[in-house]
Swiss-Prot record:
Glycosylation sites: 62, 116
Annotated disulfide bonds: 54-112, 68-123, 86-138, 93-100
One of the record's GO cellular component terms: extracellular region
Main localization category: secreted
GO MF annotation, one: lyase activity
Family indicated by similarity: Belongs to the pancreatic ribonuclease family.
Residues in the signal sequence: 1-28
Compartment annotation: Secreted
GO biological process, one term: defense response to Gram-positive bacterium
A Pfam family hit: RnaseA
Coiled coil segments of this chain: none
Species: Saimiri sciureus (Common squirrel monkey)
Protein name: Ribonuclease pancreatic
Length: 156
């Protein structure tokens, strides 16, 4: 009798475990907006002439774990100014999607590019400071940047 009750509850237990296994990983997952901030925002600082800025930041922001991210851009502007780009000039993203926006003014950025011959785990980057318009993909509610698409020179 007790065995029959246990067997009757087994499918319910399996279902609960499956649901928990599906829901639980998403609870700790970084949102696309938070990932954008981690990978691209550095409002507090500017590398000045620090040649190791990219090496330090790429490592500190977890972009050299398991592989060397080939290219990354850090934006040295207040987060609210970068978020405002989502309500500026609409442009087509590199991948053809229609949710990209170009900043109306140029912004202080640092381009980090993997140097030739650099291999994981010894990721080495070239640091280049620039003043460029940025193009970001935006989504969500609130509508915020979730992807850094490009930087472009002032077209005037």
């Amino acid at each position: 009798m007790a065995l029959e009750k246990s067997l009757a509850l087994l499918p319910l237990l399996v279902l609960v475990l499956l649901v928990l296994g599906w829901v639980q990983p998403s609870l700790g997952r970084e949102s696309r907006a938070k990932k954008f901030q981690r990978q691209h925002m550095d409002s507090d600082g500017s590398p000045s002439s620090n040649p190791t800025y990219c090496n330090d930041m790429m490592r500190r922001r977890n972009m050299t774990q398991g592989r060397c991210k080939p290219v990354n851009t850090f934006v040295h502007e207040p987060l609210v100014d970068v978020q405002d780009v989502c309500f500026q000039e609409k442009v087509t993203c590199k991948n053809g999607q229609a949710n990209c926006y170009k900043s109306s003014s140029s912004m202080h950025i640092t381009d980090c590019r993997l140097t030739n011959g650099s291999r994981y785990p010894n990721c080495a980057y070239r640091t280049s400071q620039k003043e460029r318009h940025i193009i970001v993909a935006c989504e969500g509610n609130p509508y915020v940047p979730v992807h850094f698409d490009a930087s472009v020179e002032d077209s005037t």
